[in-house]
Structure formats: structure tokens, C-alpha cells
């Protein structure tokens, strides 16, 4: 009740005391009405007092945070004549620049768009530039081409970051990372304005740590466009799908509709060797396992953007993902046991998001996700001593997540700014599994559990921008978190400094803190059998881990990136295998360690040869230290150096045909325990 009163009071406060701060916008074009990117727009008062500056985006648009009664705009670009514009309205309109006449005889100057731009401490990438020479078909694939970003087994990582979060349009969502990945895989690249990479997310994003913010394009003209695409891949099985989308836009309204259907079939082989000691005897267990999965996934999204007026906007979006009749099969054959496991699943996800943006710097939004999962599985096992066991299991999960937030920004004099906001998130989880038809010597336990999770947070931020491009920001977020009988107050500081010696030399330093909570299913006292030897156990009382991250980055010529990083994670938890001491069983279980610490460096070097070859070399070197005093009966404290090298190559073999080849090498590293 106390949290609700605080939130209500804060909403009233920000809605009543927010002064009328606005923005001045416009668009820069050439004489052929083509947008001009990279033009510098300087705003002054009529008495020449400096107010602020901006750089035009890829579509020629610019935004200045100031809104004086009258002003003077100075527009400059290396290839165009400087122009002065006087204005009194918040819409500066379309400003046309005339090209300079250099009179260079038989000389062709080809410009290269910068790979990265720094805006308010954020590393901004134009995905259309990155995907010009890359074989990408959707927004998710374009994100994997960002410098320092790698994908492994469906998980994205950023070089030098402990973890990575993806957000859309700078706002949180109650969708999981897997559900958000599905959304981006069904989003065309041409719907994305840019991707912003931050090693220390500002508090108004309501996430912490490293973040990639995917900014969708806005349309303010009369247009209709659509796209149909198909994809095919073969990894033992043939898989593929089809996607369709269209956008209808007017100056007041934009409607986006997308639908995709994918036939997903995968195959994976694993080999296991376990030297298991039991009752002073050593058993050498070998096992080969074949894992296959087949399913159809249907994805739909409908988004509506309504421009109430020039300064006020309302966005509503619905996202659905449905995977009925999924079938997973595991067949294991080894020296200790033979087993087969069939699992049939039915998963559904529905999400709705609402966001209101006002001209006074206030944003209010909410998000709701409903997720249901049902599964039925059957397992048969025969041990080497001819003993047999079997069971059938019915299980499921029901999750409801709600979130609301409000953010307020104020632009002060001399390019100072402040921000503050609140957020509240509530989640309700219900898990169950019931064993039936149990035969043989197998331990089973029916479980049914309910969890309620609440998170309330508030923050205050301060930032400063200089005309040279240098900027800094600091913030502190207070959070109250509760789940079950666990209650915790925490404060998360954040700081970021960007120094521009010149556009060719950019330095950035960031500090962030975060807390990572275990999944709901991981905290249940359940046992799930993977085969006749391996099993998965829950961990009631699993503690969240706290992350501290320090990153330093140097960007040379807006394309070459060099970084140093340090991360320390207290109460680190990971799912690790453990050989049971009372029976022949390999137990996979999440446990808390003392800490996990990493220190290292990364280098990103893009290069090209003519118009036919484009490449990027990524090098990462780091030392990891892992310590755990209470890992069952085998405590450990170990260090290990690791080096990773990745070379991404794109060959232009035709006007509309490209070939990609990626090479990766990694030195041995610690896996599990």
C-alpha cells in the first residue's frame, strides 16, 4: 500500500509541476529534395547568444531541445553553402541547401559514411549503412552486425559487457529476450532508424548495464508500403518461413501490421564422458545423445501511432507469438543407460504496450504480457543392469507481467539537463508438474508453486552537453524488490563521460551497476529428468547476483574501436553439472558462487577492398576469475585467460548478390565447474 501511495503522489507531482519545455525540429534537404545527413545546425538568440546545436540524421531531420520565442539557425555542411534562417515557431520546416561548386576537373571524390556517431554519450549506428554490404533480411540480423556484437545459440553479447539488454524505442517491455528476438526477426531493416549502443544505460530506459536501443522510424507523410519475404536454411533438417508486412501512414496516423510463420526444425548431437566416483568405485560413463526439435511458430504485430498534435504522440502496439504442437525428442545411448524422451509443448504469448509522449518532456507508458506454456512428456529408460523405468509428466507455466512508468526531462540553461521518473512492475507466476504411470526405481515429486514479484523504482539524473560534443551524465536509481519472502532495498549509481577531442578522436568512460534475478522455474523445488543419467533440479532460495561494470572506449576516425573493461559479479549463479555422491546421476543445478570477475580488452577493425570486399576483425582478450567456497563438496578458486578472434567477411559477387563467410577462433576456457 505504501508503494502505491508513493507512486500516485509522484505521478501527481510530475504532471502538476512540469514546466512547458519543448523542442524545435526541422529537415535539411538539397535542391533535389534529397535529405542531407551530417549537417551542423547551431541555434542562437537574435543577440547571438548560443543556445544549442544538433546534427541532421540520415533522413535529414534534426531536433533541438530549445524552444525560444525567436531564434537564428546557422546550417553548415562541408559540401553545401552555409545558410542562416530566422524563426519563431517550433517547426523550422524544410531547409534547402545549395551545393558548393569546387570545379574539380576529372576528379571524383567519394565520401564514406561514418560507421559510428556519438550523440549524448550514445554510440549511434545507422543500420541501413551496416546492411548495405551485408546479407541481412531483418532487424535482428542487422543488430548482429553491429561492431562488438556476437550471437551464440540465440543469445546476443557485447564485447566488454557482462550482459546485454535490447529495448525498442527506449522503453522497457515485459517480453522476455527470446520473445523480443522473435519480434525483431519479423521487423524489416528499413523500419529501423538507428541502433544506439550504451555500455551504461541511462535510468529513463528502466534497465541497467549494457543496452542496445532499437529506434523505429516515424512516418509523417501519405504513403503505403509493404513487403513480403521468405527464408530457408538447412542444418540437418530443412527449415524456413514467410513474412509479410505493410505500413499505412498519414501526417496524423501510422499503422504497422506484420505477420510471420516459421517452420523450425533443429538437430543437435552431444557427447558425454563422466568419471563418476561412488562408494570408492570409479565408473567411466560414456553417452551419445541426439536432440531434435520440430515446431511451427506464428508471430503477429500491430502497431498504431497517433500524432495528437505537433508535440503529443500516442503509441499502441500488440505483439503475439504462438507455437502450438511443438515436439522435442531426446535419444541417449551409452555405457550406463539407454533412454528416449518425447516432449510435446504448446506456448502462447500476448503483449500490449501503450506509450504517451508529451511536448513538456513527460512520457507515460505501460506494458502487459501474458505467457502460457503446457507440456506433456514421456520417458523410457533401461540401465546397464537391465533395470527399466518410465513415467509420463504433465506440466505448465502461467505468467502475467504488468509494468507502468513515467519519465520527465527538463532542459536547463547552458545545456544542463535533469530527469526523474518512477516505475512499478508486478509479475505473477504459477508453475506445476505432475508425474503419472511411474515404473521402476525413479524419484518423482509432484510440484505446484505460486510466486508474486514486485519491483518499485525511482531515479534522478543530471547531464551536461558542451558545444564541442563532450558530455557527461550521472544518475542514481533506488529500487525496492520483493519475491516470496525475499525483500531488498538497493541503490544503483550510473555515470557516463564522453570526450570529443575531434570527430576523429572520441573517448568514452562509463560505470554501471545492476542486479540479475534468477528465473521463476529455477527457484522451484522441482526435478526434471533429461535422460536416464542427467537431471535438472531447481534451487529454492537462489539469490540474485549484483554486477559492477567499468568500460573505457576509444573511437578512431569514427570506425576503429578500442576498449578496456572490468566486471565484478557478486553472488554469481550459473547452471553447472555435479556428480551426485549417493547415486549415479549427473545433476544440473543453479548455485550461487562467491563472485565472477573479468578484466580484458577488445579491438574492432573494419576494412574493405574496393566495392567487392568488406570485412571486420574483432579481437577480445580477457582473464576470468571464479570463486565458490560452497559448491557441494568441491569448492574452487581458479583463473583462466581466454582469447577470441572473429573475422566477418562479405564478398560482393553480383549487383544484388553477396556471400558471407565468418571465421572464429577461441582458446580453451572454463566450462561449468
Where are these regions (language model features)?
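Short, acidic, small-residue-rich periplasmic hinge/interaction motif at the N-terminus
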Residues: 42-44, 76-80, 92-131, 151-153, ...
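A short, solvent-exposed loop/turn motif at the edges and junctions
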Residues: 44-49, 72-86
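Short, acidic Ser/Thr/Gly-rich low-complexity loop/linker segments typical of extracellular
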Residues: 47-61
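N-terminal periplasmic accessory domains that precede
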Residues: 93-96, 139-142, 180-182, 196-197, ...
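Extracytoplasmic beta-strand/coil segments of soluble accessory domains associated
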Residues: 140-175
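Short acidic/polar hinge/loop motifs at secondary-structure boundaries
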Residues: 173-200, 244
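Face-selective signature of the C-terminal outer-membrane beta-barrel domain
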Residues: 253, 297-323, 341-493, 498-504, ...
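Outer-membrane beta-barrel signature, preferentially recognizing the C-terminal barrel domain
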Residues: 397, 515-564, 568-570, 586-600, ...
Amino acid at each position: 500500500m505504501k508503494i502505491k501511495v508513493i507512486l500516485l503522489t509522484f505521478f501527481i507531482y510530475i504532471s502538476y509541476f512540469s514546466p512547458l519545455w519543448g523542442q524545435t525540429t526541422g529537415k535539411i534537404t538539397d535542391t533535389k529534395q534529397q535529405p542531407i545527413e551530417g549537417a551542423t545546425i547551431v541555434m542562437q538568440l537574435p543577440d547571438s547568444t548560443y543556445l544549442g546545436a544538433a546534427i541532421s540524421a540520415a533522413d535529414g531531420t534534426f531536433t533541438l531541445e530549445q524552444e525560444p520565442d525567436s531564434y537564428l539557425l546557422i546550417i553548415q555542411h562541408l559540401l553545401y553553402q552555409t545558410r542562416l534562417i530566422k524563426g519563431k515557431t517550433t517547426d523550422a520546416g524544410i531547409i534547402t541547401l545549395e551545393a558548393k561548386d569546387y570545379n574539380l576537373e576529372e576528379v571524383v571524390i567519394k565520401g564514406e559514411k561514418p560507421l559510428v556517431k556519438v550523440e549524448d554519450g550514445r554510440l549511434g549506428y545507422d543500420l541501413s549503412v551496416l546492411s548495405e554490404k551485408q546479407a541481412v533480411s531483418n532487424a535482428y540480423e542487422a543488430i548482429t552486425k553491429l561492431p562488438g556484437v556476437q550471437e551464440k545459440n540465440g543469445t546476443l553479447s557485447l564485447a566488454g559487457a557482462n550482459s546485454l539488454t535490447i529495448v525498442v524505442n527506449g522503453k522497457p517491455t515485459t517480453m522476455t529476450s527470446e520473445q523480443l528476438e522473435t519480434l525483431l526477426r519479423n521487423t524489416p531493416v528499413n523500419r529501423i532508424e538507428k541502433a544506439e549502443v550504451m555500455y551504461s544505460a541511462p535510468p529513463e530506459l528502466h534497465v541497467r548495464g549494457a543496452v542496445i536501443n532499437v529506434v523505429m522510424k516515424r512516418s509523417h507523410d501519405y504513403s503505403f508500403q509493404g513487403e513480403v519475404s521468405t527464408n530457408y536454411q538447412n542444418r540437418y533438417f530443412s527449415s524456413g518461413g514467410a513474412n509479410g508486412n505493410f505500413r499505412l501512414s498519414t501526417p496524423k496516423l501510422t499503422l504497422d501490421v506484420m505477420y510471420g510463420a516459421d517452420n523450425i526444425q533443429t538437430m543437435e548431437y552431444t557427447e558425454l564422458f563422466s568419471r563418476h566416483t561412488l562408494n570408492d568405485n570409479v565408473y567411466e560413463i560414456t553417452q551419445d545423445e541426439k536432440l531434435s526439435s520440430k515446431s511451427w511458430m506464428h508471430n503477429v504485430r500491430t502497431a498504431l501511432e497517433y500524432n495528437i498534435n505537433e508535440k503529443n504522440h500516442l503509441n499502441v502496439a500488440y505483439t503475439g507469438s504462438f507455437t502450438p504442437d511443438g515436439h522435442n525428442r531426446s535419444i541417449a545411448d551409452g555405457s550406463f543407460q539407454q533412454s528416449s524422451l518425447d516432449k510435446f509443448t504448446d506456448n502462447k504469448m500476448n503483449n500490449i504496450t501503450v506509450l504517451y509522449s508529451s511536448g513538456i518532456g513527460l512520457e507515460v507508458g505501460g506494458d502487459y504480457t501474458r505467457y502460457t506454456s503446457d507440456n506433456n512428456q514421456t520417458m523410457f529408460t533401461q540401465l546397464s543392469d537391465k533395470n527399466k523405468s518410465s513415467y509420463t509428466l504433465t506440466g505448465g507455466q502461467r505468467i502475467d507481467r504488468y509494468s507502468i512508468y513515467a519519465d520527465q526531462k527538463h532542459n536547463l540553461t547552458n545545456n544542463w539537463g535533469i530527469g526523474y521518473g518512477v516505475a512499478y512492475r508486478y509479475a505473477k507466476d504459477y508453475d506445476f508438474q505432475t508425474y503419472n504411470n511411474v515404473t521402476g526405481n525413479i524419484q518423482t515429486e509432484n510440484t505446484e508453486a505460486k510466486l508474486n514479484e514486485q519491483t518499485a523504482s525511482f531515479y534522478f539524473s543530471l547531464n551536461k552537453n558542451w558545444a564541442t560534443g563532450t558530455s557527461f551524465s550521472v544518475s542514481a536509481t533506488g529500487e525496492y524488490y520483493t519475491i516470496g519472502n525475499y525483500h531488498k532495498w538497493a541503490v544503483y549509481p550510473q555515470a557516463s563521460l564522453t570526450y570529443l577531442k575531434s570527430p576523429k578522436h572520441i573517448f568514452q568512460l562509463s560505470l554501471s551497476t545492476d542486479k540479475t534475478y534468477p528465473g521463476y522455474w529455477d527457484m522451484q523445488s522441482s526435478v526434471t529428468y533429461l535422460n536416464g543419467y542427467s537431471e535438472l533440479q531447481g534451487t529454492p532460495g537462489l539469490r540474485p547476483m549484483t554486477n559492477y561494470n567499468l568500460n573505457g572506449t576509444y573511437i578512431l576516425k569514427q570506425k576503429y574501436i578500442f576498449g578496456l573493461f572490468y566486471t565484478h559479479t557478486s553472488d554469481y549463479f550459473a547452471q553447472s553439472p555435479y556428480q551426485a555422491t549417493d547415486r549415479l546421476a549427473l545433476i544440473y543445478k543453479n548455485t550461487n558462487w562467491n563472485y565472477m570477475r573479468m578484466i580484458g580488452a577488445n579491438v574492432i577493425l573494419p576494412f574493405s577492398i574496393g566495392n567487392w570486399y568488406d570485412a571486420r576483425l574483432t579481437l577480445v582478450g580477457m582473464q576470468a576469475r571464479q570463486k565458490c567456497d560452497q559448491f557441494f563438496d568441491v569448492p574452487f578458486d581458479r583463473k583462466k585467460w581466454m582469447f577470441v578472434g572473429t573475422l566477418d567477411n562479405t564478398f560482393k559477387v553480383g549487383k544484388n548478390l553477396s556471400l558471407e563467410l565468418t571465421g572464429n577462433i577461441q582458446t580453451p576456457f572454463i566450462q561449468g565447474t
